[in-house]
Amino acid sequence: MVQKPIPLPDGSMIRLTVSRYYTPTGRCIQKPYENGKMEEYHHDLIDRYNRGELMSADSIHFPDSMKYNTLVTERIVYGGGGIMPDVFIPVDTARYTDYHRKLVASGLVNRVSMNYLDRNRNRMMAKYPKFQQYKQDFVVEEDLMEELLKMAGDEKIEFEEEQYNRSKPLIMLQIKALIARDLYDMAQYFQIINDDNPSYQKALQIINNKETYNRLLGR
């Protein structure tokens, strides 16, 4: 939805919804909502997850009333309920364990990254003055992972070894990306985190393949 920020006298701000959101092709992607159905609106994402829509394209169904022809190529897409991608990438749930969720939700992954940089900022800037050098050479060491586990124990987060081992590569990537964000900028965070983003990598593959691009997005 499109929201207009309105400053208030006490320094706070409200964001007032003023219109639905349309893409440049003229396609409405506003999630539908009706008066009296607020609970359904807020539970939409979890309901889609429970129906398997994030894991299998076959679980997603659109009524014909949502069909829309794009303005230029006249491809059939579906409007009014979010964007159905041209190429469906299922969510990989294997690495996103409950233990990983607790570490992130408690702020520990972010905190251990900040603590590391507070101790090593000058050394890191001297060793990695350029981001590309950092991206290529910096490795999250086991000592830092042990520090994270100790912090988790102090917060009474019960250690789950099997879940930790499954999520460990993802946690290490997130720590590296968070350090890059604070050492350089947000753009560098995404350059690292997107290296392991299947949707992003598939999009790059399609964009860089003219034949595939035209087949999927042409008239």
Where are these regions (language model features)?
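Conserved functional hotspot residues or short segments at active or partner-binding sites
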Residues: 28-29, 33, 38-219
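Conserved phosphate-handling catalytic cores of large alpha/beta enzymes
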Residues: 2-38
